[in-house]
Amino acid sequence: MTIKNLLRKNIAAIIEKKQSKKSIYPIRNIRLDSNENLFGSPLAANYHQQNGDLSFSISEKISRIKGVPTNNIFFGNGNYEICNALVSAFCEPRMDNILICPPTIEIFEQIADIQGVAVKKVLLINDYQLDIEGIAEAIDEGTKIIFLCSPNNPTANTITREDIEILLNNFDGLLVLDETYINYARQRSFWYEIKEYPNLVILQNFDIAWGLYALNVAMAFGSENAIEILQKISPERGVSKASFEIIERAIDNIDQINQWIKDTVMLRGFLARELQQINIIRKVYPSETNFLLVRFSIDVNIAHDYLLKNGIVVKNCHNEILCENCLRISVGTLQENEKLLKVLKTLTL
């Protein structure tokens, strides 16, 4: 199977005729082709220049960290841009559809709605796992993409590998797996399987574990065909040179990042155990992320407002399907977690 067969006809034609964005020039040259500012940048860095080979340099470093070849890596301006490109490439408006499994993040449905692509929904079951039979029944010839999050947001759990593999082996379309929180999970990433499954695209980013949320830079891992498609239909400018330079510095501090991940997991365990001891909390769901989904035995709106009154902001998930009476609570510093616990213990009805 080649995913190019799934492309919209007009997109396939664009990809066929479009040359690679990367041009090769001599090391020393006079660049009079890009309309850059001849005086340079008012900043110390050469921000008047285009990215040049910086994206390839970052690809090489990420390749060494993750063990994925550079031609299986793509960088985009956030998960939204990459997902938007994939829906544009594979889904014919008013004809095709995507499939999602709520509760999950909103961007998949939002992108489809904007592009006039129908959305099929199959709810999670049994501790927020996939309803494989329900998905099989919902899929039709117009289903081009299944979007999943593992670990999932807001439920915080990973999807079982066996279920994901069932979909990869039996679904003829594209499976996009958002692994934004995979750094905090015990389950290993699916990037090792991209050679085995040409219909798999994995999304990760530098937002959370890397601490670079402000940059809004994401990575896609997939087959060479998938990466070529993304390269040829994505915006010409792509990720900024300034963002790549910051990412490069962060990569040089990978040991610090890995330590922060370990510390977050430790604090997550502490917070989960302590929350479960509070009498107004019914359940703290197992987490493979940097947040906890917590179900309350009292009206969750009261708990949410009480925390807010005491200067603590959390996410109220009560109106999300299958998350009734739940708050999503990010793991904070030890001091922040202790204050949260102290405030919740003082909440009486």
Description of each model-found segment:
Residues N199-Q277, V284:
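PLP-dependent aminotransferase class I/II
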Residues V265, I278-N310:
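Conserved PLP-binding catalytic core of the aspartate aminotransferase-like
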